[in-house]
């Protein structure tokens, strides 16, 4: 299938073939993908986030399954966000850690942490063999929006502390998008995944961006249901963004 949009063409969307669902082992999935050869894709990306799309490398996609609508786009209204008790404890527990924003350029330390994270947290998940090429293809976008938010132990004698987490984040003129976070698997007690989102929310507030996109919430899924804890949360119902509800129906309509 040839796909090659021109600057004045209508935006083209393509539906993928069925593939194993990445969340439910007994289901098949398909996605809508924007034409990856469209030269306007970088400019479209900020609006695509508001349409419920996500970035993986240079692909913009959205789940589009015939018999399942469990993947619900969600975003945090950062100006209305209030951390709950558990999140406040997470911040206090990690108050000595250092956070910094760096260019989205892979280095050996980040790659080592990424591979260790995948090996221990997602064994046999299809990504645990990732190396430098896969890291770049998956995480580093081509349009200049990407940043790496590093979370480290405090420096010692001028030497940077241990790298504990990297939150791959896209910073657009409208919002932040949490692309992927990987962290030290042997530091589970710190709640580094939660900490990363809390710091991304603070980052969005500093940059005066009203939203942090968290991708897809899946009700009762052991890996995806946690996103409901970051309130005030909004869901995309296929037409517009609404206040979060665990019972609100969703559609596939663009």
From Swiss-Prot:
Highest taxon listed in the record's lineage: Bacteria
Q: GO cellular-component terms in the record?
A: cytoplasm
Q: Name one GO biological process term.
A: ubiquitin-dependent protein catabolic process via the N-end rule pathway
**Could you tell me which InterPro entries the record lists for this protein?**
Acyl_CoA_acyltransferase, Asp_Glu_LeuTrfase, N-end_Aminoacyl_Trfase, N-end_Aminoacyl_Trfase_C, N-end_Aminoacyl_Trfase_N
Q: Which GO terms describe its molecular function?
A: arginyl-tRNA--protein transferase activity; leucyl-tRNA--protein transferase activity
Q: What is any Pfam family matched here?
A: ATE_C
Q: What is its EC number?
A: 2.3.2.29
Catalytic activities: N-terminal L-glutamyl-[protein] + L-leucyl-tRNA(Leu) = N-terminal L-leucyl-L-glutamyl-[protein] + tRNA(Leu) + H(+); N-terminal L-aspartyl-[protein] + L-leucyl-tRNA(Leu) = N-terminal L-leucyl-L-aspartyl-[protein] + tRNA(Leu) + H(+)
Functional note:
Functions in the N-end rule pathway of protein degradation where it conjugates Leu from its aminoacyl-tRNA to the N-termini of proteins containing an N-terminal aspartate or glutamate.
Family according to the record = Belongs to the R-transferase family. Bpt subfamily.
The protein depicted here goes by the name: Aspartate/glutamate leucyltransferase
This chain's source organism reads Xylella fastidiosa (strain 9a5c)
Q: What is this organism's lineage?
A: Bacteria, Pseudomonadati, Pseudomonadota, Gammaproteobacteria, Lysobacterales
Gene from which this protein is expressed? bpt
């Amino acid at each position: 299938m040839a796909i090659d949009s021109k600057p004045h063409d209508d935006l083209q969307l393509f539906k993928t073939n069925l593939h194993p669902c990445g969340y439910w082992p007994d289901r098949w999935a398909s996605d809508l993908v924007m034409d990856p050869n469209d030269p306007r894709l970088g400019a479209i990306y900020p609006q695509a986030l508001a349409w419920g799309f996500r970035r993986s490398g240079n692909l913009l996609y959205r789940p589009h399954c015939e018999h399942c609508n469990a993947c619900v786009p969600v975003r945090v209204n950062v100006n209305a966000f209030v951390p709950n008790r558990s999140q406040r404890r997470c911040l206090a527990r990690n108050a000595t850690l250092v956070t910094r924003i760096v260019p989205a350029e892979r280095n050996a330390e980040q790659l080592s942490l990424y591979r260790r994270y995948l090996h221990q947290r997602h064994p046999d998940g299809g990504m645990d063999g990732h190396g430098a090429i896969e890291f770049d293809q998956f995480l580093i976008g081509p349009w200049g929006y990407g940043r790496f938010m590093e979370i480290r132990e405090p420096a010692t004698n001028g030497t940077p502390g241990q790298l504990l987490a990297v939150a791959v984040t896209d910073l657009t003129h409208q919002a932040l998008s949490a692309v992927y976070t990987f962290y030290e698997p042997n530091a589970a007690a710190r709640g580094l995944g939660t900490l990363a989102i809390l710091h991304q929310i603070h980052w969005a507030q500093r940059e005066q961006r009203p939203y942090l996109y968290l991708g897809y919430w899946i009700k009762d899924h052991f890996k995806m249901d946690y996103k409901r804890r970051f309130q005030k949360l909004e869901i995309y119902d296929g037409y517009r963004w609404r206040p979060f509800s665990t019972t609100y129906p969703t559609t596939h309509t663009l």
